[in-house]
Swiss-Prot record:
Organs and tissues of expression: Testis.
Protein's UniProt keywords contain DNA-binding: yes
Signal peptide positions on this chain: none
Keyword Transferase: no
Chain residue ranges for the region called Disordered: 1-61
Gene from which this protein is expressed: PRM1
PROSITE patterns from the UniProt entry: PROTAMINE_P1 (PS00048)
Keywords linked to the UniProt accession: Chromosome, Developmental protein, Differentiation, DNA condensation, DNA-binding, Nucleosome core, Nucleus, Spermatogenesis
Localization per record: Nucleus; Chromosome
Protein's recorded name: Sperm protamine P1
GO cellular component, as recorded: nucleosome; nucleus
Main function: Protamines substitute for histones in the chromatin of sperm during the haploid phase of spermatogenesis. They compact sperm DNA into a highly condensed, stable and inactive complex.
Molecular-function GO term, any one: DNA binding
Amino acid sequence: MARYRHSRSRSRXRYRRRRRRRSRYRSRRRRYRGSRRSRSRRRGRRRGYSRRRYSRRRRRY
């Protein structure tokens, strides 16, 4: 556990440099209108996505 704590403090630093890049990414993401929606969509894809796709195909036929 102590080892993990040490690595965490080390990443902090690193996070500071990363923060600058993240702000730029955020501004670009803000341009997209459904950024929040895309996130939820990703979650749905992970949960039983194949099943939804199959049902859609069946409906089309």
